[in-house]
Structures are given as C-alpha cells and as structure tokens.
C-alpha cells in the first residue's frame, strides 16, 4: 500500500487513496496498468456546495501512464470517495526568474517557467477534454480573468465539474479562470 506513495510520511488521506489503488489493482482488467503507478501527494481542497476536490499529484514521467487509465480511475475513485471530485496533476517545479545580478549558471528551461507550469496545470485539470481556446479579460481594477474554452464533445463528462476546476485552479495558482463550453448556454 505504501509502495504507491512516494512521500516519506503519508497522511491518512493518502493512505486511504493508496488502499483504493490497491483494491482497484485486484481487478484483472486494471492490474497491468495500475501496478507501476505511484503518486507523490494529495491535497484536499474545499469547493462550492460543500463538496471537496482531491488533487492527486503524480511524478511528471508517469503522467502518460496515468492518462491511459485516467477516466476509469477517476470514476472508480469518485465512487469510493463520494462528494469529492478527483483530479490528477503532474507535480511540476517552477524555477525563479534569474536576477540581473546573478551569475548566469544555466538557462532556465521553458517548461519550468511560471506561465508554462500554469498552462500545464490547466491542461491536466480538464484532461479528457481538450482546451480549444483561451481569452483574457481585463477588468477595470486591473485584474485579469482567463476564459478557457473547452471542447464540446466531452461536455457530459466534465460539465458537472467545471466549478470544481475553477476553484482548484484558483487555489493552486492564484489566478481567476472561467471555464466555458461553446454551444451551451450558462
């Protein structure tokens, strides 16, 4: 069970999710895909309506393996943890912008910049659905709201989670975002 968790001192919630992983691994059709999968940590975040969201942070190299079984795994974990939306995110590192005075050691890769990491978090949040467009609205006070347009073909799978996605992204990055599915009126 603790072989599924990569952190040294797992919390009670992480142990419960690891146990759920082990239980799901006992099913023959998921066994091969779930055996190598591990996660680093889990954050439980309160969202609107008294619901909670579980953000499961996974190592970036194993994200592709998670994507293969993510829809099924999410469905099964949401059954085991009712009133919680489950989201899988890669745990990415943001390197600080190099100071002008600092000696140039190594160029900071684009994948470690704040913008790139926040964009990847957005893609991970809405995974089965694709992002088809982004718009930025500037408010009078100088605040920005990012409007994210999602593909309408997967709208039934993600529609009920849009508020959770919005709250999660806001808590993780501090940026305001609005998710919209074109062709639907809200």
Curated annotation (Swiss-Prot):
GO biological process: ribosomal small subunit biogenesis; rRNA processing; translation
Complex and partners: Component of the small ribosomal subunit. Mature ribosomes consist of a small (40S) and a large (60S) subunit. The 40S subunit contains about 32 different proteins and 1 molecule of RNA (18S). The 60S subunit contains 45 different proteins and 3 molecules of RNA (25S, 5.8S and 5S).
Matching PANTHER family: 40S RIBOSOMAL PROTEIN S7, SMALL RIBOSOMAL SUBUNIT PROTEIN ES7
Keyword Cytoplasm part of the UniProt annotation: yes
Domain of life: Eukaryota
Family designation: Belongs to the eukaryotic ribosomal protein eS7 family.
Record protein name field: Small ribosomal subunit protein eS7
Subcellular location: Cytoplasm
Annotated function: Component of the ribosome, a large ribonucleoprotein complex responsible for the synthesis of proteins in the cell. The small ribosomal subunit (SSU) binds messenger RNAs (mRNAs) and translates the encoded message by selecting cognate aminoacyl-transfer RNA (tRNA) molecules. The large subunit (LSU) contains the ribosomal catalytic site termed the peptidyl transferase center (PTC), which catalyzes the formation of peptide bonds, thereby polymerizing the amino acids delivered by tRNAs into a polypeptide chain.
Keywords: Cytoplasm, Ribonucleoprotein, Ribosomal protein
First-listed, main subcellular location of the protein, grouped into a coarse class: cytoplasm
GO CC list: cell surface; cytosolic small ribosomal subunit; small-subunit processome
Name of the coding gene: RPS7A
InterPro entries according to UniProt: Ribosomal_eS7 (IPR000554), Ribosomal_eS7_CS (IPR047861)
GO molecular function: structural constituent of ribosome
């Amino acid at each position: 069970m603790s072989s599924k968790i990569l952190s040294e001192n797992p919390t009670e919630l992480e142990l419960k999710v690891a146990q759920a992983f082990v239980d799901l691994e006992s099913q023959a059709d998921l066994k091969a895909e779930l055996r190598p999968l591990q996660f680093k940590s889990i954050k439980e975040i309160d969202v609107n309506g008294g619901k909670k969201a579980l953000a499961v942070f996974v190592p970036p190299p194993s994200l592709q393996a998670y994507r293969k079984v993510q829809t099924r795994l999410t469905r099964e974990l949401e059954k085991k943890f009712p009133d919680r939306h489950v989201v899988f995110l890669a745990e990415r590192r943001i390197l600080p912008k190099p100071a002008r005075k600092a000696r140039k050691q190594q160029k900071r890769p684009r994948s470690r910049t704040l913008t790139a990491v926040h964009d990847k978090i957005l893609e991970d949040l809405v995974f089965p659905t694709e992002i088809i467009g982004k718009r930025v609205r500037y408010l009078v006070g100088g605040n920005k709201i990012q409007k994210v347009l999602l593909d309408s073909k997967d709208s039934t799978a993600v529609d009920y989670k849009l508020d959770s996605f919005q709250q999660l992204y806001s808590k993780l990055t501090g940026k305001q975002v609005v998710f919209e599915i074109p062709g639907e009126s809200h």
